[in-house]
């Protein structure tokens, strides 16, 4: 063996050899099949530039694009019981939780954050579908209630981005208890005269649609979002009939009066800021820290009359 064998040949092989490319460098558009560079998607809020298809977005990416200059303060989620039923199916529930936390770097499926949009201070509650399908368990329920309580304490409007497959089956009845708890939290926000806007993203299904996700003053849906209690396949198998084209999709629900508007993720921030200014009856500024808040119902009626 000599220096050519030991040093030169490996160098040449490393320079000319086939290089492995990261698997997630290019992402396929589910609608058109087009391959899109992941950096372009990140910059475009995970909306495919050509087709407008909305790819699922993480809670952290959504907050970064939603708040002014990407600046916000996250609230610490309250502690909740872990695996109270010692549940196990194909895997232990506690193992699924551990994997979800490692995958998303989140404590659970809900993130609360306070920041400004067009100078207006708000509280945003975001569900991350990557964490066990955004399912609603005790920890997620506690986080949602904490978000509403903080909004009332600090006199802030609340914007909730729903993304969930429904109640977390591994927690049984303890998961279902979060439906009335979150509903009561919404009522307290409304009693305080604070606006509540819900953004329904893909998908928003199950018990989430039977509670806080459908109790907003204004309901906005992202294009193509699946929204409903039971999924379309379950309904078809139950009624033994073919459902209409686009059934339970955002555009279909808009046509049938279930949501107020369908808005692209790229226009979401501006749309919500405009709605909140109407509900709060004032123009938001960077310096304005205090405001007199009318009841949402009165503000909505006035806005409709004057439109």
UniProtKB/Swiss-Prot annotation:
The keyword Manganese does not apply. Residues 25-294 form the CoA carboxyltransferase N-terminal domain. One of its GO terms (molecular function) is acetyl-CoA carboxylase activity. Its EC number is 2.1.3.15. It catalyses: N(6)-carboxybiotinyl-L-lysyl-[protein] + acetyl-CoA = N(6)-biotinyl-L-lysyl-[protein] + malonyl-CoA. SUPFAM superfamilies: ClpP/crotonase (SSF52096). InterPro entries: AcCoA_carboxyl_beta, Acetyl_CoA_COase_Trfase_b_su, ClpP/crotonase-like_dom_sf, COA_CT_N. One of its GO terms (cellular component) is acetate CoA-transferase complex. Pathway: Lipid metabolism; malonyl-CoA biosynthesis; malonyl-CoA from acetyl-CoA: step 1/1. Its main location: cytoplasm. The keyword Transit peptide does not apply. It is found in: Cytoplasm. Keywords: ATP-binding, Cytoplasm, Fatty acid biosynthesis, Fatty acid metabolism, Lipid biosynthesis, Lipid metabolism, Nucleotide-binding, Transferase. GO terms for biological process: fatty acid biosynthetic process; malonyl-CoA biosynthetic process. Belongs to the AccD/PCCB family. Component of the acetyl coenzyme A carboxylase (ACC) complex. Biotin carboxylase (BC) catalyzes the carboxylation of biotin on its carrier protein (BCCP) and then the CO(2) group is transferred by the transcarboxylase to acetyl-CoA to form malonyl-CoA. Acetyl-CoA carboxylase is a heterohexamer composed of biotin carboxyl carrier protein (AccB), biotin carboxylase (AccC) and two subunits each of ACCase subunit alpha (AccA) and ACCase subunit beta (AccD). HAMAP family: AcetylCoA_CT_beta. This is Acetyl-coenzyme A carboxylase carboxyl transferase subunit beta. It comes from Chelativorans sp. (strain BNC1). The gene is accD.
